[in-house]
């Protein structure tokens, strides 16, 4: 699952998704273009879940309506994220190969361990900075550039590089999500805890 601003794809790709969560939108009432895309995707088998404190026209057309308290959508997604992490509902291989979560960061500053080099933009001819990020290779037990072929990146853990402590972004994410339990989410959003778990599982 992908959560957050710009994590979603264009509506024309909705038919390829298993589930689409709609938050902060009432597209059935406000956008004929987007509502057409929603209906087409439903015909293709995509399930739509609508987060809305009221039973809006979009909630009425969705496959599932979650009537949470107004303004608590972020809390709902935080609770979902923690549940997904705790239950390991993510695609581990995809996360390792296609996200920045294995990258090493300084836990004090939140900045990635990286080398910065000067390069020239081939299109503009202007100088640009190129960053090479580091991850922990379990095969060599050392920090290596994220572009290293054949490396076995660690997804989680704490490591020492040049005498300094680093953790993976995944480790930091798990730590940051620790307070957002199902119980906290249920109380904040005024919905049953099993609703949060159900949506996260889907």
Each language-model region and where it sits:
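Anionic-ligand anchoring segments at beta-strand to alpha-helix junctions in alpha/beta enzyme folds, i.e.
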Residues: 1-16
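Solvent-exposed alpha-helices and their adjacent loops that cap or buttress functional pockets
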Residues: 12-15, 41-42, 58-59
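Short acidic, glycine-rich surface-loop motifs adjacent to enzyme active sites
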Residues: 17-28
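Glycine/threonine-rich flexible loop motifs
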Residues: 27-36
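Long, well-ordered, tryptophan-enriched scaffold segments
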Residues: 56-202
């Amino acid at each position: 699952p992908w959560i957050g601003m710009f994590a979603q794809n264009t509506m024309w790709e909705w038919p390829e998704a298993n589930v689409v969560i709609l938050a902060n939108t009432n597209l059935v009432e406000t956008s004929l273009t987007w509502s057409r895309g929603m209906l087409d995707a439903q015909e293709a088998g995509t399930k739509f879940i609508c987060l809305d404190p009221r039973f809006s026209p979009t909630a009425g057309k969705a496959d599932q309506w979650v009537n949470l308290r107004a303004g608590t959508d972020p809390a709902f997604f935080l609770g979902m994220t923690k549940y997904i992490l705790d239950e390991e509902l993510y695609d581990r291989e995809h996360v390792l190969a296609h996200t920045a979560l294995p990258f090493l960061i300084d836990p004090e500053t939140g900045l990635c361990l990286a080398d910065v080099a000067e390069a020239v933009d081939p299109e503009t001819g202007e100088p640009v900075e190129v960053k090479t990020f580091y991850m922990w290779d379990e095969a060599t037990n050392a920090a290596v550039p994220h572009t290293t072929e054949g490396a076995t990146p660690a997804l989680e853990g704490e490591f020492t590089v040049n005498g300094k402590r680093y953790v993976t972004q995944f480790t930091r994410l798990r730590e940051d999500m620790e307070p957002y339990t199902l119980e906290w989410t249920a109380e904040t959003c005024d919905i049953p805890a099993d609703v949060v778990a159900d949506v996260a599982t889907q």
